[in-house]
Amino acid sequence: MQANQDTHNAQSKLTDSNESTGDKLSILVVSGRSGSGKTSVLNILEDLGFYSIDNLPLSLVPEAAQKLVCDSGIKRIALGVDIRTPRADLSNFDAIHDSLKQTYGEEAVTVMYVTAQEETLVARFNATRRIHPLMVLDTKGVENNVYNLPAAIEKEIQLLQPIFKHADIKIDTSMLNIHQLKERLRDYVGVDNQIVINLLSFGFKYGSPIDADFVFDVRILPNPHWNPTLRSATGLDAEVSAFFADYPEVAEMTGDIATFLNRWLPDFLHNNRHTVTVAIGCTGGKHRSVFITKHLQDRLQNSLPEGLTVTAKHREKHRW
């Protein structure tokens, strides 16, 4: 009965607060794999105007949200939760997630999951000489049935599954430096009242982006790399555009991808999504994927409904 009363009080205060200000409420629950950069994400979110709390026990998330939103009137909140939270809290995340949505509204609550590829996590732990949280003590390692770093990483994936399945935003930091991470987060949360479509060109030879919602492979198209005069150019250069103009299949593929995205992105975004990442890949991420990503940005910005922002990023730009 007391819990229901608290929820009712929170909803009443929230309604009053929203009516008195035009600010949009945003509650981010930030979680993810150890070594993936959750603390960096929370620090950046703080720079972007969020009130950030790290390493919060999951069971205290509803209470923290109520105190910050209803008692203090804070509108942008990022609450960090990691594997150190009690196991019972993790298994109860469905109920916690539903409670937050019911209290503050579907669009106000977002789960952000930060991850990285296993080899990247291993390299980071080795470089910093830090111990994975599941291996802090030998006795704890035995208790968790993990005896080495790869086993701890694998075990953590299983334990965090209740949070991962609710993730609205997934960020893979494997190939991001701190500046790129800040730019990515700004795209996700820095534009109020807008939905962001992130177009990302990349090279398959450097690995596929695991945080993409859609991946299109354009390696079947003619490759300017084999033209010696174009090898040093990129898909943003006029001479590469002229090269592609001689191949109608390039325009056809660009049009087909645009048609697919125009048809399905609006429906995809109706599921309370604030961002969608569309990755376009070629071999090296320099010519074909860059060209198509740029042209898709122009086409989608003019054809998608109002309120959608389309950004274009080129993951391999530092390699050009």
Swiss-Prot record:
Entry binding sites for GTP: D82, I83, R84, T85
InterPro entries: P-loop_NTPase, RapZ-like, RapZ-like_N, RapZ_C
Statement: the UniProt record of this protein carries the keyword GTP-binding: yes
Binding site for ATP: G32, R33, S34, G35, S36, G37, K38, T39
Superkingdom classification of source: Bacteria
Keywords, comma-separated and alphabetical: ATP-binding, GTP-binding, Nucleotide-binding
GO molecular function: ATP binding; GTP binding
Pfam families for this protein: PapZ_C, RapZ-like_N
Record flagged with keyword GTP-binding: yes
Family (UniProt): Belongs to the RapZ-like family.
Function statement: Displays ATPase and GTPase activities.
Protein name: Nucleotide-binding protein Pcryo_0127
Organism: Psychrobacter cryohalolentis (strain ATCC BAA-1226 / DSM 17306 / VKM B-2378 / K5)
